[in-house]
Design a protein with these regions (language model features):
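Flexible "cap/lid" loop of the alpha/beta hydrolase fold
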Residues: 63-69, 140-159
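Gly/Ala-rich beta-loop-alpha elbow adjacent to hydrolase catalytic centers
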Residues: 112-117, 121
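Serine-hydrolase catalytic machinery in alpha/beta-hydrolase-like enzymes
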Residues: 4-104
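Alpha/beta-hydrolase fold nucleophile elbow
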Residues: 103-113
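A conserved short beta-strand
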Residues: 130-142
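Short, proline-enriched alpha-helix->beta-strand connector loops that line the catalytic pocket
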Residues: 19-20, 107, 153-158
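Short beta-strand/loop motif that positions the catalytic acidic residue
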Residues: 159-166
Length: 166
């Protein structure tokens, strides 16, 4: 399986049948392999679900072994918005490849992520033309509320999880 983003893939146990996909997006400085560890417990409860964990499309600016969806070292909100939209475009290309390969529609795909991956999942989940099954986010936020208000197209079900120290 070759996609536009290098990915760690965790297939369902004992089944070739794939009915659902969970796309797990790592946080700033992480990679697909790191976040794929979540799938090891989840897959016991989600038969026929494939977990696809891409690396960000850019090397991380402060961690040369990790990746990023956009650079967080700059504090310019316009720059961050522009870079996050570039990342969204790359992720949309990636998601379309997954949909084609596994013959899935958005309603069979969950977007999930940690920190910066959560931020990307929220934006993708709310600006898509077609509603995703859900977004499950950990320790993230909306990148730019004003921009998202303008671009929001669907009301995807969202579960956001934060610790009491976030």
């Amino acid at each position: 399986m070759t996609f536009c983003l290098e990915s760690t893939i965790v297939k369902p146990n004992g089944s070739e049948k794939i009915d659902n996909a969970i796309i797990l997006l790592h946080g700033y400085g992480g990679d697909g392999k790191d976040i794929s560890m979540l799938s090891l417990n989840w897959k016991r409860h989600l038969p026929n679900t494939i977990f696809i964990c891409p690396n960000g499309h850019e090397k991380c600016s402060i961690n040369p072994t990790g990746f990023q969806w956009f650079d967080l070292t700059k504090e310019d909100p316009i720059y961050i918005l522009e870079q996050s939209i570039k990342a969204e475009n790359k992720l949309n290309e990636f998601i379309n490849e997954i949909k084609d390969m596994f013959k899935l529609k958005n309603d069979k795909i969950c977007l999930s992520g940690f920190s910066q991956g959560c931020m990307m999942s929220l934006n993708l989940g709310l600006t898509s033309e077609e509603k995703f099954n859900c977004v499950v986010g950990f320790s993230g936020k909306i990148i730019n509320q004003e921009d998202l208000k303008k671009r929001k197209k669907v009301s995807t079900n969202i579960l956001l999880i934060h610790g009491d120290m976030d």
